Amino acid sequence: MPFLLGLRQDKEACVGTNNQSYICDTGHCCGQSQCCNYYYELWWFWLVWTIIIILSCCCVCHHRRAKHRLQAQQRQHEINLIAYREAHNYSALPFYFRFLPNYLLPPYEEVVNRPPTPPPPYSAFQLQQQQLLPPQCGPAGGSPPGIDPTRGSQGAQSSPLSEPSRSSTRPPSIADPDPSDLPVDRAATKAPGMEPSGSVAGLGELDPGAFLDKDAECREELLKDDSSEHGAPDSKEKTPGRHRRFTGDSGIEVCVCNRGHHDDDLKEFNTLIDDALDGPLDFCDSCHVRPPGDEEEGLCQSSEEQAREPGHPHLPRPPACLLLNTINEQDSPNSQSSSSPS
């Protein structure tokens, strides 16, 4: 074949073995004593093709890697563009989503910076008592005999006179300011003016005739407990006749104590509470037993201890004195043993 012939068609002198020369009429020198007429018979022919094939493979691999990298970048760019359009182009929403307002979910920064909402009240029973029962129980004015007027005014101030002005959504864990911060004469002047209106407004929802005498006894007993057992302005959180027990959901279940009362009075009070609150009233079974650190201090004293106290005759208590004040968790049991009745 003419295209496989050598480039040189003239005679060529070749050097063979032992420096012997020979002449090739056609083709070119090949080997020791041969004349080659085709290129595939040369050794460098295959070397050149091998190098060409290796370089071609390298170029193909590099091209494929570059192509894959470019496609990945293009896909990521398309994904980012789609996400950006979905987040900022509200017209691309489906038809049934276009009429929804944009303020259904607040921004993340607003949720993080907003203060936490207050927890719910301890129980629905306590919230209903704040709305239905009178804010305080007791006569319109005056204090029982044998009580210091200064302490009596502080006790009157410690009673929930400011409860009508409180918001119903205020969490019960927030304690009221200390009554020692306010002047004594101001509390003494405010007590006679505010007590009748609060008592009449609260008793108008239930039965005024049934609670009138019981409220007077409850108020008198409360002032005696404040002056004898507590003897300090911080005793506003002490409410006799109320026990607390922890329920497991970080709340305190408040129940009413039944101690030494007649059956007819208890039935009458229970009937009134059931009619007002549409549910049975939970009375404590452990009122006569005082577990350490689980009930308010000085609330469940035995009748013998109360009889031995000088100047404090035993008075029949109503079935319950429902003054819903916040429980002070920081009171220690040693604070009551150090105070003595005046």
Curated annotation (Swiss-Prot):
Basic and acidic residues composition bias: which ranges? 212-240
What single Pfam family name could you report for this chain, choosing any that match? Answer: WBP-1
Q: Give the subcellular location.
A: Membrane
Checking InterPro entries in the record gives: WBP1-like, WW_domain-binding
The Low complexity compositionally biased stretches are 158-173
Biological processes per GO annotation: CXCL12-activated CXCR4 signaling pathway; hemopoiesis; positive regulation of protein ubiquitination
Q: Membrane topology for this entry?
A: Single-pass membrane protein
- Molecular functions per Gene Ontology: ubiquitin protein ligase binding
tRNA processing keyword on record: no
For this record, an example GO cellular component is:
membrane
Q: So where does this one cross the membrane?
A: 42-62
Show the segment(s) annotated as Disordered.
133-247, 292-320
Q: Which residues carry this modification: Phosphoserine?
A: 173
Name the record gives this protein: WW domain binding protein 1-like
| Phylogenetic placement of the source organism | Eukaryota, Metazoa, Chordata, Craniata, Vertebrata
